[in-house]
Amino acid sequence: MAGLALQPGTALLCYSCKAQVSNEDCLQVENCTQLGEQCWTARIRAVGLLTVISKGCSLNCVDDSQDYYVGKKNITCCDTDLCNASGAHALQPAAAILALLPALGLLLWGPGQL
């Protein structure tokens, strides 16, 4: 099915990046030269705070989503030019503030006061 998006003599174009924390850092375009390749995006979120994004071309892309104790992994595949543009926000502001509150408490009052 992925090959249907390709016309003879053309290649699929996908955004490409490795382990970026912002979708804005994933603007490099990769030329997928093998017939049947798809664009993919992987988002790995650790404890709701930090999201790492990777993108590129793949012959064996499979949509996948897994929840782990410390985070979540999500892989999406698509087969049209630059279809893997969307990413995830690198840091959720409210979650970051909530996560930093205990550390701030330790700095201000010390470990014995918490």
Swiss-Prot record:
Record InterPro entries: Ly-6/neurotoxin-like_GPI-ap, LY6_UPA_recep-like, Snake_toxin-like_sf, Toxin/TOLIP
Domain of life assignment: Eukaryota
SUPFAM superfamilies per record: Snake toxin-like
Every UPAR/Ly6 domain range: 12-86
Post-translational modification, as annotated: N-glycosylated.
GO cellular component: extracellular exosome; extracellular region; plasma membrane; side of membrane; synapse
Major site of localization recorded for this protein: membrane
GO annotation terms (biological process): acetylcholine receptor signaling pathway; negative regulation of ERK1 and ERK2 cascade; regulation of neurotransmitter receptor activity
Signal peptide: 1-11
Propeptide segments, given as residue ranges: 86-114
Known tissue expression: Highly expressed in prostate (basal, secretory and neuroendocrine epithelium cells). Also found in bladder (transitional epithelium), placenta (trophoblasts), stomach (neuroendocrine cells), colon (neuroendocrine cells) and kidney (collecting ducts). Overexpressed in prostate cancers and expression is correlated with tumor stage, grade and androgen-independence. Highly expressed in prostate cancer bone metastases. Expressed in gastric epithelial cells, mainly in the isthmus (at protein level). Not detected in normal intestinal epithelium (at protein level).
Pfam family of the protein (one): Toxin_TOLIP
The keyword Transport is assigned to this record: no
Membrane-protein topology: Lipid-anchor; GPI-anchor
Subcellular location: Cell membrane
Keywords: Cell membrane, Disulfide bond, Glycoprotein, GPI-anchor, Lipoprotein, Membrane, Signal
PANTHER family noted in UniProt: PROSTATE STEM CELL ANTIGEN (PTHR16983:SF1), UPAR/LY6 DOMAIN-CONTAINING PROTEIN (PTHR16983)
Assembly behavior: Interacts with CHRNA4.
Function: May be involved in the regulation of cell proliferation. Has a cell-proliferation inhibition activity in vitro.
Name recorded for this polypeptide: Prostate stem cell antigen
Organism: Homo sapiens
Higher taxonomy: Eukaryota, Metazoa, Chordata, Craniata, Vertebrata
